[in-house]
Amino acid sequence: MAKDLQVLTALDVAKTQLYHFTAIVIAGMGFFTDAYDLFCISLVTKLLGRIYYHHEGALKPGSLPPNVAAAVNGVAFCGTLAGQLFFGWLGDKLGRKKVYGMTLMLMVICSIASGLSFGHTPKSVMATLCFFRFWLGFGIGGDYPLSATIMSEYANKKTRGAFIAAVFAMQGFGILAGGMVAIIVSAAFKNQFPAPAYKDGALASTISQADFVWRIIVMFGAIPTALTYYWRMKMPETARYTALVAKNLKQATNDMSKVLQVEIEPEQEKVEEISQGNDFGLFTKQFLRRHGLHLLGTASTWFLLDIAFYSQNLFQKDIFSAIGWIPPAETMNALEEVYRIARAQTLIALCSTVPGYWFTVAFIDKIGRFAIQLMGFFFMTVFMFALAIPYTHWTHKDNRIGFVIMYSLTFFFANFGPNATTFVVPAEIFPARLRSTCHGISAAAGKAGAMVGAFGFLYAAQSTDPKKTDAGYPAGIGVRNSLIVLGCVNFLGMLFTLLVPESKGKSLEEMSRENEGEDENGTEMRASGRTVPV
């Protein structure tokens, strides 16, 4: 059976080597682009409003209408969700490596095309941008299940969690790169082409060269991704796919002998034994009996986490304005606004978002996925309620720094918590022939939650007083009530975490139970040791 295969045992016990770190960089570049893209578009939406939606004589600079802003920011989410489902399924059908190249090329081409969006009217430019951002998201979506699956199937038992989490943590570098590129490009153009503040010269405050600024920022994300294409194509197919799905033990042994630089026996006679009792499909009775609750656990926790995680971005504008990092829009020119927004968001990322990722990498194989996820949801719940219940206290000028610290801590415990573990666990607990598909389903549930968080709460967080809402938005339930709802969402995440098994220190075959067969009566032979914490 699978547990007897020397090639898989060799991978499980292999010492940490150069190929592990090479795999992290190659797989992580997709997440670098993912974070860069989602982050950089939020830096340039204000600029897009000034360029394409300027109204003569208006007291404030132009801004994207709510429906256009939602489309520009949200269309990539829709593409990502579709890509996660499609490429997740395709990765199990055709193999990880074949599909991996497709997703990367799609990301590179659509990143560049997004920056070349054209049209005679503002509406046509935004429509072209949205079209290419959907397909960019589609490619990024494919990277989620494939990168996680490839890293989990290459890693050893001892440090597998840290390696998969490190791939995901490349998002942190993508966020920082997005901020730094926006700062450098906007500063360079600002110095070269001085312009007055909006209140001193409405039309002159947005220079014609500003149109190049957002295009350069959007396109830059394609460069590091394109550089890894060669190495992606050089990676051999994972041994677990070749042996357990394609049933080609000889090829798997040859590939891993080169990678690990050790002699491994082919064991071709075990091919039939591998699949005995492990040929059930997705959503069959046997799948639901073995993995149904696990899939519910991974999908629901990712869904709930992303509602809370992506809705937190809604409060950034209030925070930045409150602490004076971003002055009123009319007191700045277009490029000054890009510079200020990029600087503020990069500082928040540097102080709270990025450290959280690497705390997970450091501790995931020491204290386990289950403990980190439960702890993360717990502290996110605590901090959300701590912000919500005395909300009027935090709005006073003297308490604003405290509000920023509390806000930063929710981001920290999202990343040193469920934001990382919801990505890691689905790559470890499902059978090889369904691993990529199940990870894609879990990730797609997460993106559905992201859409609820980013857009549902964009409307919900509006003031209950119609006179105080943002332009174009109806009255909502207010920020305080929104924070209370988000606290409840995080608490639900804690409860659904109880469905997620602990995979620390176990092989993929132990977790997926591919090292079990069926006896002559067709009943399952269960491996010793429970997987679900109680």
UniProtKB/Swiss-Prot annotation:
Gene (UniProt): PT1
Membrane topology classification: Multi-pass membrane protein
GO MF annotation, one: phosphate transmembrane transporter activity
Residue spans, topological domain Cytoplasmic: 1-23, 91-98, 146-163, 232-290, 365-369, 422-440, 503-534
Expression triggers: By ethylene during corolla senescence.
Name recorded for this polypeptide: Low affinity inorganic phosphate transporter 1
GO BP: ethylene-activated signaling pathway; floral organ senescence; phosphate ion transport; response to ethylene
Ranges where the record places region Disordered: 507-534
Residue spans crossing the bilayer: 24-44, 70-90, 99-119, 125-145, 164-184, 211-231, 291-311, 344-364, 370-390, 401-421, 441-461, 482-502
Family indicated by similarity: Belongs to the major facilitator superfamily. Phosphate:H(+) symporter (TC 2.A.1.9) family.
Recorded catalytic activity of this chain's protein: phosphate(in) + H(+)(in) = phosphate(out) + H(+)(out)
All ranges on the Extracellular side of the membrane: 45-69, 120-124, 185-210, 312-343, 391-400, 462-481
Main location (coarse class): membrane
Pfam families: Sugar_tr (PF00083)
Further facts: Although related to the sugar transporter family, it does not transport sugars.
Role, per record: Low-affinity transporter for external inorganic phosphate (Pi). Involved in phosphorus (P) remobilization from dying to developing tissues during corolla senescence in an ethylene-dependent manner.
Organism: Petunia hybrida (Petunia)
GO cellular component: plasma membrane
UniProtKB keywords: Cell membrane, Ethylene signaling pathway, Membrane, Phosphate transport, Symport, Transmembrane, Transmembrane helix, Transport
Annotated localization: Cell membrane
PANTHER family: SOLUTE CARRIER FAMILY 22 MEMBER (PTHR24064)
